[in-house]
């Protein structure tokens, strides 16, 4: 089964064939670290971490690079407002970013380059563009000359005449064409700066990714990814800079994830529906947030609401409960061989369907459907009078494997059998002492942990709900 990726550049699904056999070079645009990330910022790390995980599962060696923009207009503004320097603010929010995305199940990139640590190669990149005639200096600023790059607009599929008609030259800009964009910005008084051939200043946003992608992944990369909002102008400008310099294809597959809406409204500060990750993960299990995000195909918009989140949680808990019941039943099962083939064959079908979904442009929504199918099938199997250790181990292994591919964990902070038995004994003692309030409290606490008690003439029985 081959993997197919929807390529924004061609607007169609294409068979994925990396430049080098069994190796994938992948660049994902990272955050500008001037504040905590919101849930819209968190979607790309989760989506493309899942893409990476699946590629690794399929046997690819993935070089995954995701940058930090640690000098920028927003950082300078934040520094001025807080009375701190730019590096201090950047360091704080780099650390906060790692805390947030790690909680959401994202692995660290192979490399997390920072702009300020790569200033030399950025300046060299700009100088080469100037030497080739693709860029020009204007009163300390350096701009990219878009009319010199014939392919400008090919990613966003917009005619250059339309782009030029909608563009304008802002006050203070000294560019020759409204479509030209800054590669280097002359420093204003009091701003952080670096020395360059054009005077003191700092790089423009777009050139940073081009330079760092080239440094760590080479002239041509396999997959370049990011949010839908980056396709134009950021990724369009990256293509122009990189291909003008090297004369080679910059990225072979372009992937973009969709937006997030809050209660059917576009997320924005003005509407007051701005949700920060470090706030939401205090309210909800980060694993639930990830499961929710992956329950929709990455190219589609997501509507984020508490009702939908709760509904998703119910589904996730059903899968985890089935997994817990399988683990609980493991010890009481035997090494039966009769009728194993049917159940194991069905498991193989679910595995195939999961991979078919992921091979189809990483359709995690359909892949998650197969997780539900495995859980439902497992529950049916557990109704059998006699169960086989071989089959139960196969269910457990499959659920663990599929969850791991999606960056999810099945491990529940659940009570051990011995702990449950001890609480039941404590409840029995409470009933003997006519302490019915304590007895009911223990029963309710166990119910909250998905442990169902049944009082019978033979004593108290329990099961995982």
UniProtKB/Swiss-Prot annotation:
Location(s), subcellular: Cytoplasm
Main location: cytoplasm
Cofactor note: Binds 1 zinc ion per subunit.
Cytoplasm keyword on record: yes
Phosphoserine modified-residue sites: 270
Binding-site positions, ATP: 269
Entry keyword set: Aminoacyl-tRNA synthetase, ATP-binding, Cytoplasm, Ligase, Metal-binding, Nucleotide-binding, Phosphoprotein, Protein biosynthesis, Zinc
Record's catalysed reaction(s): tRNA(Cys) + L-cysteine + ATP = L-cysteinyl-tRNA(Cys) + AMP + diphosphate
EC number(s) from the headed UniProt entry: 6.1.1.16
CDD domains (alphabetical): CysRS_core
Example of a GO cellular component annotation carried by this entry: cytosol
GO MF, one annotated term: ATP binding
Cofactor dependency: Zn(2+)
Xref: InterPro entries: Cys-tRNA-ligase, Cys-tRNA-synt_Ia_DALR, Cys-tRNA/MSH_ligase, Rossmann-like_a/b/a_fold, tRNA-synt_1_cat_dom, tRNAsynth_Ia_anticodon-bd
Group of enzyme by EC: ligase
Residues reported to bind Zn(2+): 29, 209, 234, 238
Renumbered ranges of motif 'KMSKS' region: 266-270
Motif ('HIGH' region): 31-41
Top-rank taxon: Bacteria
Biological process, per Gene Ontology: cysteinyl-tRNA aminoacylation
Family, as annotated: Belongs to the class-I aminoacyl-tRNA synthetase family.
Subunit architecture: Monomer.
Protein name: Cysteine--tRNA ligase
GN (gene name): cysS
């Amino acid at each position: 089964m081959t993997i197919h990726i929807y390529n924004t550049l061609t607007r169609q699904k294409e068979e994925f064939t990396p430049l080098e056999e069994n190796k994938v070079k992948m660049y994902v645009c990272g955050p500008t670290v001037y504040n905590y990330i919101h849930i819209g910022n968190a979607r790309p790390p989760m989506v493309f971490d899942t893409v990476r995980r699946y590629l690794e599962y399929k046997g690819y060696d993935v070089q995954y690079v995701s940058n930090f923009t640690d000098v920028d207009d927003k950082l300078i503004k934040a520094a001025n407002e807080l009375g701190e320097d730019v590096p201090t603010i950047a360091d704080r929010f780099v650390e906060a970013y790692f805390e947030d995305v790690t909680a959401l199940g994202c692995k660290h990139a192979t490399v997390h380059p920072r702009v300020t640590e790569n200033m030399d190669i950025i300046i060299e990149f700009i100088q080469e563009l100037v030497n080739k005639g693709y860029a020009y200096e204007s009163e300390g600023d350096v701009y990219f000359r878009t009319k010199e790059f014939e392919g400008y607009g090919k990613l966003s599929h917009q005619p250059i005449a339309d782009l030029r008609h909608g563009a304008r030259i802002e006050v203070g800009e000294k560019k020759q064409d409204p479509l030209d964009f800054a590669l280097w910005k002359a420093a204003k008084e009091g701003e952080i700066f670096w020395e360059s051939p054009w005077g003191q200043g700092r790089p423009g946003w777009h050139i940073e990714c081009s330079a760092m992608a080239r440094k760590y992944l080479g002239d041509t990369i396999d997959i370049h990814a990011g949010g839908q909002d980056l396709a134009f102008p950021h990724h369009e400008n990256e293509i122009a800079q990189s291909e003008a310099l090297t004369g080679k294809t910059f990225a072979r597959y372009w992937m973009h994830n969709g937006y997030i809406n809050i209660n059917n409204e576009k997320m924005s500060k003005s509407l007051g529906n701005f949700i920060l990750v470090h706030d939401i993960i205090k309210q909800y299990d980060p694993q639930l947030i990830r499961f929710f995000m992956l329950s929709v195909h990455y190219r589609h918009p997501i509507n984020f609401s508490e009702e939908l989140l709760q509904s998703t949680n119910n589904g996730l808990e059903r899968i985890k409960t089935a997994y817990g019941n399988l683990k609980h039943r493991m010890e009481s099962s035997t090494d039966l061989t009769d009728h194993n083939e049917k159940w194991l064959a069905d498991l193989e079908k679910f595995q195939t369907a999961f991979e078919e979904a992921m091979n189809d442009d990483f359709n995690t929504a359909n892949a998650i459907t197969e997780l539900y199918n495995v859980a439902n099938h497992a529950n049916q199997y557990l109704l059998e009078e006699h169960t086989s250790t071989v089959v139960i181990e196969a269910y457990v292994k499959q659920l663990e494997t599929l969850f791991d591919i999606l960056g999810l964990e099945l491990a529940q902070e659940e009570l051990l059998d011995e702990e449950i038995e001890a609480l039941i004994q404590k409840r029995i003692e409470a009933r003997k002492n006519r302490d019915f309030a304590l007895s009911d409290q223990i029963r309710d606490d166990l119910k909250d942990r998905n442990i169902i008690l049944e009082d019978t003439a033979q004593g108290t029985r329990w099961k995982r709900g």
